[in-house]
Amino acid sequence: MKVSVLITLAVLGVMFVWTSAAEQEDHGSDRRDSPALLKNLLGEEVFQSEERACRELLGGCSKDSDCCAHLECRKKWPYHCVWDWTIGK
């Protein structure tokens, strides 16, 4: 019984990957949801507003000022921005 369930799940997984690949091939290199395309359409001003003047949202950092508001640089490795447990402006 367990083997037949595992085989069924494996077949369904392979079919999903196969149909997804076929659908991607039908559409070609359609990049409608690409972040680069959104930046080109909306312009840099949308992504660089005064409110978002921070350098790192959740990426690497070396000091607290590298992170966005309400985030701080983690003190131990791996260094990245984490929530500093504050809310509000």
UniProtKB/Swiss-Prot annotation:
UniProt cross-references to Pfam families, sorted A to Z: Toxin_12
Keyword Disulfide bond: yes
Molecular-function GO term, any one: toxin activity
Disulfide partners: C54-C68, C61-C73, C67-C81
UniProt signal peptide: 1-22
Modified residue annotations for Isoleucine amide: I87
Propiece residue ranges: 23-52
Subcellular location: Secreted
Source organism superkingdom: Eukaryota
Swiss-Prot/TrEMBL keywords: Amidation, Cardiotoxin, Disulfide bond, Ion channel impairing toxin, Knottin, Neurotoxin, Secreted, Signal, Toxin, Voltage-gated sodium channel impairing toxin
Chief localization: secreted
Glycoprotein recorded as keyword: no
Listed GO CC annotations: extracellular region
Tissues in which the UniProt entry reports expression: Expressed by the venom gland.
Function description: Gating-modifier toxin that inhibits voltage-gated sodium channel Nav by shifting the threshold for channel activation to more positive potentials. This toxin moderately inhibits human Nav1.7/SCN9A (IC(50)=459 nM) and weakly inhibits hNav1.2/SCN2A and hNav1.5/SCN5A (<20% inhibition at 1 uM peptide). Inhibition of Nav1.7 is voltage-dependent, with lower inhibition at more positive test pulses.
Domain notes from UniProt: The presence of a 'disulfide through disulfide knot' structurally defines this protein as a knottin.
Family: Belongs to the neurotoxin 10 (Hwtx-1) family. 39 (Jztx-34) subfamily.
Protein name: Mu-theraphotoxin-Phlo1a
Species of provenance: Phlogius sp.
